[in-house]
């Protein structure tokens, strides 16, 4: 059994794992042993207490109280006010909102969904809706449509009206998470000069849809309880990893929540490859010392590997303990066998502990790419989040 230490992202955190590295059937990483580190004791990724995280996805109804809370000390009163306003939200109203303090020119990426809702119109037909926002929810737009006008022309015109109505430029990129809508969305975006990006990294949008289900759709007079989503998310069987995405070695690792925050904040400053999440917007209530589970990958081609990974729209990682594989999910419906390990009672226990730790952290985890697992820096860092499929 080999024992190794991975020091991630310049924080000097030594994390030891004990795994027999092996080639899975769709080989990803070599079976070379990691160098031992005698100065550290072994640390198994342990499950923490369940996270108290609540996703506070900013809504239009809470914007005024959020702004006021910044100028007053009575936060609890403002939150109560926000909650009561949300309860009185008109389920028939459409949203057209831009945060007055937002840099309109700086909103270069949108997240959008164009799909049916569990609502019937006067004809007894499904109502469709366009929902658009940015990652910070500074921009929010919704519009309902009859099912007779669902095409790329309708979507193109609606997206153009978002820009004109709010006085913002069209974005450079628009993310969407439903693979079934790729043709319509791509065509509409292309005609506007916007790059359509299939991606499940639409975290703000997904959380806003959850909120709208509770505050809008379920209160609509045409709401159909128990209706399943028309377009469900794909979850295909994982395939072999492309040759250019192979690494040399990998390790289960952990970082304190405070260090994860630092790494995300430093991404833009260092122009590193990777992607973060707005942890404040998501409302993570974790202790700064809570250990966040992750995967560290060593590669002699770390920079090219990180660059290639940067184009994948990585959204999550999970362990398939039955097949002793690590699965990488990217885009909207892509799943790769990213790594494998020799299956045993010990490795299965460690993999299960890693998954349990992830669940205890509200689904938060990360992927780090390094030139050396014993180095004190990383070339690429992706903060990832497990999210359930949207209710619509």
Swiss-Prot record:
Coiled coil: none annotated. Residues 72-90 have a biased composition (Acidic residues). GO terms for molecular function: RNA binding. Disulfide bonds: none annotated. Residues 1-45 form a transit peptide. It is found in: Plastid, Chloroplast. This is Protein TAB2 homolog, chloroplastic.
